[in-house]
Amino acid sequence: MMLSRPKPGESEVDLLRFQSQFLEAGAAPAVQLVKGSRRHGDAPPDRLPPQDHRDVVMLDNLPDLPPALLPAPAKRARPSPGHPLPHDEDPEERLNRHDQHITAVLSKIVERDTSSVTVTLPVPSGVAFPPVFHRSQERQVKPAASGKRSIFAQEIAARRVSGNRVTSAEQVVPSLDTPEGAVPCETPSFRDRSNQLPGRSHGFHRPNLVTGKGLRSKVAEQEVQTIHEENVARLQAMDPEEILKEQQQLLAQLDPSLVAFLRSHSQVQEQTGTKATKKQSPKRPSVLVTKEEPVTSTRTREPRTGDKLEEKPEATVEDKMEDKLQPRTPALKLPMTPSKDWLHMDTVELDKLHWTQDLPPLRRQQTQERMQARFSLQGELLAPDVDLPTHLGLHHHGEEAERAGYSLQELFHLTRSQVSQQRALALQVLSQIVGRAQAGEFGDRLVGSVLRLLLDAGFLFLLRFSLDDRVDSVIAAAVRALRTLLVAPGDEELLDRTFSWYHGASVFPLMPSQDDKEDEDEDEELETEKVKRKTPEEGSRPPPDLARHDVIKGLLATNLLPRLRYVLEVTCPGPSVILDILAVLIRLARHSLESAMRVLECPRLMETIVQEFLPTSWSPIGVGPTPSLYKVPCASAMKLLRVLASAGRNIAARLLSGFDVRSRLCRFIAEAPHDLALPPEEAEILTTEAFRLWAVAASYGQGGDLYRELYPVLLRALQTLPTELSAHPLQPLAMQRVAALFTLLTQLTLAASSIPPEPASGPAESCVPAIPSSVTWTQVSGLKPLVEPCLKQTLKFLPRPDVWNALGPVPSACLLFLGAYYQAWSRQSHLCPEDWLQDMERLLDESLLPLLSQPPLGSLWDSLRDCSPLCNPLSCASNPEALPSLVSLGCAGGCPPLSVAGSASPFPFLTALLSLINTLVQSHKGLCGQLSAVLTAPGLQNYFLQCVAPAPAPQLTPFSAWALHHEYHLQYLVLSFAHKAATLQPEPAASTALHHAVALVLLSRLLPGSEYLAQELLLSCVFRLEFLPESASGGPEAADFSDGLSLGSSGDPQCRRGALLVQACRDLPSIRSCYLAHCSPARASLLSSQALYCGELLRVSSLLLPVPKEPLLATDWPFQPLIHLYHRASDTPSGPPAADTVGVAMRVLQWVLVLESWRPEVLWAVPPAARLARLMCVYLVDSELFRETPIQRLVAALLARLCRPQVLPNLKLDCPLPGLTSFPDLYASFLDHFEAVSFGDHLFGALVLLPLQRRFSVTLRLALFGEHVGVLRALGLPLTQLPVPLECYTEPAEDSLPLLQLYFRALVTGTLRARWCPILYTVAVAHVNSFIFCQDPKSSDEVKTARRSMLQRTWLLTDEGLRQHLLHYKLPNSSLPEGFELYSQLPRLRQQCLQTLPTEGLQNGGVKT
């Protein structure tokens, strides 16, 4: 039945009707589908489709299939019912397949399958390039049997035929390349020749000339084999002489040109084979054994000495096996007998058997050369000479096969394997290597940083690409490695453990503090312009460039968050992978506010986490490993919400309102941890994190409505606390939960006292909503009676260090709550002050005074020095593996007990105690006298003495910034209490001067985020007369007495240092106003810090502190106003000076004089050279400023302090100075200013002369005598007023020839005269005299010529006085009018020098004495 094709008007109904008709007719279909066997391909030949009609083009030089760009996923298919697994398979093969040992994974490392790739050698050609093909070219190829072939197919076929012809011609060479006319002495022995004959070669399987072409395809191969066997039999029956004779006859019958052609091709093939043999590695046997070599011809190769081994014919495969295996060890018998029916057992393949040989012996490293690091599968660094057994899976066939372990390069190579287990294993090993490197296990055993090497090699993006894998095990390994890289061990534990400290929730962002070069170039731009430009540039920068400066930014640029969301939402990994992902998200959220916002705004990420890992209902979970975390509450998910909320108040508000976190908090807090149907440890951590999240929200004044709902729950929890605190032993997790509860109550109490901020006009403050807190004082007033018994109970354990350390932050949290409670109580204006005053007195009598009298408290004060990071800078040393692009606190092995965060640290408790004391004294000043004993504790005094001792500034690392931030809290609280006590005491305490020194040092060390503390120090301690007891105890008189002993008495009493100090003490209020105007932090930062420290929760915008790039104030902050004046004058040199220029300069000089006289340790960090540069700025500010009498007196006093004998050796102008790019440039501008406006001012001239000392750089003296010679006319400072000894300028002798020539020229020309510039005149005469009479035999010819010329010119001078001075100079003496002594008669050596001059010079004047 023949059906017509469908027509345009027919529909699907018609097609179905046609199909029904066709099926009813039962006709045979036009096409029959045949499904061949998928295993063996044993379909009948008659059913195979013909291939003649297809136009197939085969490329010999390219594989049939393109290489796989990505590793193919592992096939997940179960056996179909039609093909069950065979039950009669080999047990050994089944065991190998199910072997789960590590060696089973590493036994076959396959990166890409190349077994199917056909490798063909290029066709030899006599021309450099193949001929160009033209369509008009005639073809000799037989056309295809069926149909027309394409031009491309015909060309490929022609090339293949020509290649076959050349190959067949080459195969003729072994048979015809005979030693024609061989010399008898060069003929090899019979044994060697017999091995070289074709019949004796076991590897000769087929003939070279007889191909069977022309016969039928079925009998061609059989006939060829028959002919071959007959030829071999005849050759074996012949003698070698007969064979050679037959060869000679055959060569005589052939055309000589054909023989020459075949021999030339044989020589080319032999040379090619020799080159290939040389290129092979000597360690691996050659496997390219295809044909035997003929007897060599004496005409083609000349014999050479020692050429026997090289010319030895290549043995067959069996001979090679005998040669290689027999000399070593006897061949072992196989456990089974091989059968002839087995495939591929007739030919031994050496390259495949090479790996079965024994490993070469381990080479011992005899030298100190560096070796490649190798690691075990557990990430351990293996010693170069370690000898491990092979069953551990640490040996492979790469470089240095005898050494165990894997290098980083080999592990990177293994991550690209097609086998998923190998990729997962490589990632796991790399993860463990990173973990051990961060823990510092490698130490000095490796050269360089492992982490830096991995990141430079692209390890970060290798992990990112591995996350896109389809295999779950590879994804899990990649996530674990990413967590190991980003999340430093111990960092999160440290931050969690210190959350309940004094402002413990406020942390620095874990982001790099180094700015990019682009950011450094934009320092001069406005802030708004920088923000506008920075965002698009960062978006266009590639991820590797971002990761080079900031790893987190580079990762976020690779769309990491959507991939993690996909893994959580779609793949549903196991519990360990989920915890790793949550840990990575927490680390991303700690990076910055921007990163936290990206985590929050990632589509469906937070929704998935809240819904899947913080459900409100779940099935009970028992103790033990949880098979799945989905629909099960997870503490890490709650912690992620808490860290996100800490980044900003807006994020906290969005979490509470947009993700239904309020209901989650109610669900997890309403029940006790043991009633949550979760494992006990997980329940404790979950409840703790819920309390912390609520406390963070309460830090912004949010979450007050939850307090009303959960008020009964909180009261019940407080009532059970005494029972928990009395249990032994105390559980650390339970103590963390109790401390988190107290922290929550502290923030809720502060929220009850917060006053709504007034509407602000600034744009930075307008975003803060002025919404009053929903928590009132009435709701929190009943909490203190429940917390105070807990404090009393914990204080009883103070004499027991083991129990006290087990309490953790609980006592500190209790004290902080009480401080917040009394602070809020004192702010309630509608309540009677007498109530809270009496309650404070009761607390003092019942709790604080007994605590202060306990000896264990003194032990806490004594341990401050041991635990202080400021006194022990090495405790904050950065990890050698720390990277600037990946910030971490570096708490790998945990904190030692005697450290700022250790279990025995006194800082959290003492800081909380001082906070409570300050709150009580602020409200009740009558308690100050009873609590002042704290300030006189011996341990505190020793600690402060160590803090102000001269020492280099602590290096600012992420951990040191965190630790110092908490240490500075304690110091500030002590100083704040000392200020309150000093204002109430009639006489200053003995430790007042020490407290003042600590305040001055602390002011230069405070970090960003502590702007409010710096402002309070400037207002309170620093410029208070009470903290300068020297002003009332004979300090000015002692200063005058000291100056009289060292410098002599000054004529004018007003110029004495004592009078200047007295005036400075009177002007302290003006000095404070000056520094408040120039050293106060920015207003926005100050308001943010004030809101945080004063408990103004409605103004707090974030708990993330600014990045600690550097301290708030520079180390030379006392000179800061003066530097501002200098910069302002430099920016507007022609403008009029400011009205307050004289006042600012005078206040700065007064304060610096006070510090130089009574607090010299504060200026220890400012080098003397930097102080000199600041004094020079006084003269550069204005042309008339230095003429003011107060300025001159203060500068003279400071210059005298700078020129003291004990300070002068430390005056080094050649080293880099802080805040100064180049001192020579500053000195050059100073000389210009002196020449223009000085009018011979002596004090100005003293500052000019001070850098010209002999020990300083010659550049400064060259600048004066070369470019500013006019200065010499006005530099009339007398010798008696020189602040330093004259010998500092004249000794040692000058060795700069250009400067000596300038000296001589200035003297000869009259530019430098004794009455104009007596000091430099003396210096020039001394150095020229020393030069012209120098007898150094090592001098160069140029120096000798210049010396002789200068001496001759000196002798011929017409100025008798100058010649007398240059020739008869003896020693410098500032007491003489000339400034030096003269010889009455020239010494003999000088006379001899003069006698060496030319005779005409001597005749003119003779030798005068």
Curated annotation (Swiss-Prot):
Biased composition (Polar residues): 265-275
Highest taxon, organism lineage: Eukaryota
Keyword set, alphabetical order: DNA-binding, DNA-directed RNA polymerase, Nucleotidyltransferase, Nucleus, Phosphoprotein, Transcription, Transferase
Subcellular location: Nucleus
Composition bias type Basic and acidic residues, residue spans: 39-57, 85-95, 290-322, 528-547
Compositional bias per record (Acidic residues), positions renumbered to this chain: 516-527
A GO cellular component annotation in the UniProt record: RNA polymerase complex
UniProt-listed GO biological process terms: transcription by RNA polymerase II
UniProt modified residues of type Phosphothreonine: 337
Main location: nucleus
Keyword Transport carried by entry: no
Example GO molecular function: nucleotidyltransferase activity
Region Disordered: start-end pairs: 34-95, 189-210, 265-322, 511-547
Matches recorded under InterPro entries: ARM-type_fold (IPR016024), RNA_pol_II_AP1_C (IPR013929), RNA_pol_II_AP1_N (IPR013930), RPAP1/Rba50 (IPR039913)
Family, per entry: Belongs to the RPAP1 family.
Subunit field text: Part of an RNA polymerase II complex that contains POLR2A, POLR2B, POLR2C, POLR2D, POLR2E, POLR2F, POLR2G, POLR2H, POLR2I, POLR2J, POLR2K, POLR2L, RPAP1, FCP1 plus the general transcription factors TFIIB and TFIIF.
UniProt function note: Forms an interface between the RNA polymerase II enzyme and chaperone/scaffolding protein, suggesting that it is required to connect RNA polymerase II to regulators of protein complex formation. Required for interaction of the RNA polymerase II complex with acetylated histone H3.
Protein name: RNA polymerase II-associated protein 1
Primary gene name: Rpap1
